[in-house]
Design a protein with these regions (language model features):
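Short, Lys/Arg-rich N-terminal segment immediately upstream of the first membrane anchor
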Residues: 1-8
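Structured segments of extracytoplasmic/periplasmic soluble domains
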Residues: 52-57, 61, 70, 74-78, ...
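Extended, small/polar residue-biased N-terminal targeting/export presequences
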Residues: 58-119, 165-195, 515-525, 533-543
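Cleft-lining beta-strand/loop regions that shape enzyme active-site pockets
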Residues: 2, 20, 31-43, 47, ...
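Hydrophobic membrane-insertion alpha-helices, especially the h-region
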Residues: 11-27
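Conserved functional hotspot residues or short segments at active or partner-binding sites
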Residues: 353-354, 358-560, 567-569
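Polar, glycine-rich mid-to-C-terminal structural blocks
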Residues: 300, 312, 323-386
Length: 569
């Protein structure tokens, strides 16, 4: 055996022995003979005995619990990319975004220069009640300094059981000394429909961050409000939505389908086929709809988009989705740890499984697949999409493909016309984000008084921010390149302005600003305005990535690189 191969399989052998041994106990019969181990039963009994040998005879003391915890992820990683193990704390944290609430102080923060910076204070939350403000720096929590601490450890200091107290030491802009606020932790809502608004007098827009416990209820509230404002057509934005609860996606898409339409079905080796159909009670069955997707749209997002596409209920716009078509069932241990085991595949109404290809035990390659798409040009041209899967047909006979995500009806490539190496370096080093944060911090009160994204945008256009950024970049070892600065002016202004509006305003303000020149959103609105959201079977379907499709280009990939990561506590 090749030494490298042997080394690679050693952890797996330990993992198999540990995991199986935990489940089977010590059901074995053996004896020693001349240094050999003879085991009457084979397979699982053999590895169970191996565990016993390690525990009783290994040269050093072995912490069997640690061995189990380390081995769990390794053995599951050999099955498929989505079967996974979470320890007790990890299990709770992993579903926090999907719960309706958590217990904390009620702030969103980011880490800048090793300091906890409050981005926003949740209205009506514990922190707001005692006077914590956006822009505050949280320096201490009780007697613990938070300076230089990793974000996950900061969250553990700020979160806690409802009713418990934490004393915050805060440095406020314009003051020298720390100010102290004692916050009583409470229930903080987790919102997944984080923005909705009218783009014009007819077009509603809803942004869905994930599919959590309250997402369906939040969507109904958003739709009701938009309906009251005169909505006649709708854009649902699922870009970057990694999924969540399947039953929530089913409830949501049910609102748009006539009675008896197949939404999704699941099937596995030990899981009989189970179908989910629309009940005909949806209030928006005839509302024209366009769904925006991209490579970050996965799982429940693909169930939603697949049901709309296969039932020819609306138009899918954007780029090919992630391609997660496996169903995990959580199985909890007594200590609170959880195994999420893949037990079935899900299939869209046409019968396609959109799970992209993977090799067992090659999780890293699977995670790198999106980079491979980017490198082969798929983000820029629909011609680069590999349609090697089996062909399926929608309800009216349009051809769709399985085996690798959902290909949109209208492809919107990423735009690189204004891209330069100067902009790329500024974005990927975080300097755009840092500059926007510093500017926001210095001008927070003035910007907040403007109230709307439109007013903030008009104000920022007069501030000559491009020149200010170039000077800021020079102070941080980013060599000034005037020609590239001008070529990338549109990108710089878009993301500097966007970050500032995001820092000072709400998600709604931020998305309203971006939507005005976002090619995918513009294309979606054009489809709706022309009455083309309901697909029709064409005699000859236009090939994705055609010249017409390339007229609409998106910069969302670069946007994701420049927006600061925000944490909730």
């Amino acid at each position: 055996m090749n030494p490298d191969t042997k080394h690679r399989f050693t952890p797996l052998l330990i993992a198999i022995g540990t995991i199986v041994g935990i489940f089977i106990g010590s059901f074995y019969t053996s004896h020693f003979s001349g240094g050999r181990i003879n085991i009457i039963n084979t397979g699982s009994s053999k590895v169970g005995y191996l565990l016993q040998l390690i525990d009783n005879n290994y040269v050093d003391t072995v912490d069997m619990n640690t061995l189990v915890e380390d081995a769990m992820p390794q053995i599951l990683g050999e099955l498929d990319p989505h079967s996974s193990y979470f320890g007790p704390k990890e299990a709770e944290e992993s579903i926090e975004d999907l719960k309706g609430s958590f217990s904390g102080i009620g702030v969103q923060f980011t880490m800048e220069s090793d300091t906890v910076n409050v981005m926003s204070v949740i209205h009506g939350g514990p922190a707001e009640k005692v006077g914590v403000l956006a822009g505050d720096r949280i320096v201490t929590a009780d007697t613990t300094s938070l300076v230089g601490m990793e974000s996950d450890k900061v969250m553990k200091c700020l979160k806690g059981e409802k009713g418990t107290k934490v004393k915050l030491g805060i440095k406020r802009h314009g003051t020298k000394d720390l100010q102290y606020f004692t916050v009583v932790r409470g229930d903080i809502p987790v919102v997944s429909v984080d923005a909705f608004f009218m783009m014009d007098e007819r077009t509603g827009y809803i942004h869905v961050k994930n599919f959590g416990e309250q997402t369906y209820a939040e969507m109904l509230v958003a739709l009701a409000d938009l309906n009251m404002e005169g909505m006649k057509q709708l854009i649902v934005d699922l870009r970057g939505n990694r999924g969540g609860y399947m039953h929530i996606a089913i409830q949501m898409v049910n609102e748009f389908l006539a009675a008896g339409k197949l939404i999704v079905y699941t099937e596995g080796r030990k899981s009989p086929r189970e179908e989910f159909h629309s009940d005909g009670r949806g209030a928006f069955q005839k509302l024209p709809i366009v769904v925006l997707v991209d490579e970050g749209s996965a799982s429940a997002s693909e169930i939603f988009a697949g049901a709309i596409q296969d039932n020819d209920r609306g138009t899918i716009v954007g780029r090919r989705t992630f391609g997660k078509g496996l169903v995990q069932q959580p199985m909890e241990f007594r200590d609170g740890s959880v195994v999420r085991l893949t037990v079935a595949r899900y299939y869209t109404p046409s019968g396609r499984c959109i799970q992209k290809p993977y090799e067992k035990g090659h999780g890293e390659e699977y995670e790198m697949e999106l980079i491979a798409r980017y490198e082969r040009g798929e983000f820029f041209s629909g011609d680069s999409i590999h349609q090697d899967g089996k062909q399926y047909k929608t309800s009216i006979g349009r051809i769709v493909y399985g085996g690798g995500g959902i290909t949109p009806d209208v492809f919107v490539p990423e735009d690189t016309t204004a891209m330069t190496s100067y902009y790329r370096e500024a974005a990927y080093t975080g300097l755009i984000r840092q500059f926007a944060f510093a500017y926001s911090d210095e001008n927070r009160s003035k910007l907040a008084a403007l109230r709307t994204a439109d007013r903030m945008e008009q104000y920022l256009k007069r501030e000559n921010l491009l020149e200010k950024f170039a000077q800021f970049g020079e102070k941080h070892q980013l060599r000034r390149r005037n020609l590239m600065l001008q070529k990338s002016r549109r990108l710089f202004e878009r993301y500097i302005f966007g970050n500032i509006i995001y820092n000072v305003g709400e998600m709604k303000d931020y998305l309203m600003f971006l939507s005005k020149d976002d090619p995918a959103t513009i294309k979606a609105q054009e489809i709706l305005d022309k009455g083309l959201s309901f697909p029709v079977k064409e005699k000859e379907t236009k090939k994705e990535g055609s010249k017409e499709a390339r007229l609409y280009s998106s910069e969302s990939f670069h946007l994701h690189q420049t927006i600061v990561r925000v944490y909730r506590s």
